[in-house]
């Protein structure tokens, strides 16, 4: 996570937002899962939801967490209890667009492509999505207050085990 401290909402610049995303996706691609929850506020919303549900206004999600504590629990489950074949993920985000401001924070949107590689198989696309985020200044740095990942297909592979 970036060590640059930010002390005012006006500091939510395009460069600061881009640095946040670079750090976020780098952390995930490097499988530093224990660092992932720190990108979120204590009270946050993290949701991975099919496009059909999102557009209909339904909240039924494939994955959802409503606090940093819930995100930490997910990491614990991934690192200590779940069994799955070894794999690598690479995330390919587009540049984020600022689409609005809300309560001192900034709403952004960007596309995301997620590619999975199993050690003994060719790489495959496992997710095509649009990310709707609310970024705020919290404890002197940028964090996600909301991260809603809307994936295009109606189903995700069972193999999508890591955060997006």
Indicate where each model-derived feature is located:
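Hydrophobic pocket/interface hotspot
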Residues: 24, 36, 71, 135
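A generic "alpha-helical surface" signal
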Residues: 15-19, 27, 62, 69, ...
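A beta-strand edge to alpha-helix "cap/lid" segment located at domain peripheries
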Residues: 5, 92, 97-164
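A solvent-exposed, acidic/Ser-Thr-rich amphipathic alpha-helical stretch
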Residues: 42-111
């Amino acid at each position: 996570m970036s060590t640059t401290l930010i002390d005012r909402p006006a500091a939510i610049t395009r460069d600061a937002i881009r640095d946040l995303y670079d750090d976020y996706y780098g952390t995930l691609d490097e499988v530093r899962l224990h660092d992932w929850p720190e990108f979120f506020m204590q009270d946050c919303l993290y949701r991975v939801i099919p496009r059909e549900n999102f557009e209909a206004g339904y909240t039924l999600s494939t994955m959802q967490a409503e606090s940093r504590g819930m995100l930490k629990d997910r990491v614990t489950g991934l690192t200590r209890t779940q069994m799955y074949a070894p794999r690598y993920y690479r995330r390919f985000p587009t540049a984020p667009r600022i689409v609005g401001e809300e309560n001192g924070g900034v709403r952004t949107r960007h596309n995301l492509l997620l590619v999975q590689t199993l050690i003994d198989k060719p790489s495959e696309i496992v997710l095509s999505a649009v990310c709707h985020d609310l970024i705020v200044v919290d404890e002197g740095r940028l964090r996600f207050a909301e991260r809603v990942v809307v994936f295009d297909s109606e189903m995700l592979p069972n193999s999508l085990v890591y955060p997006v």
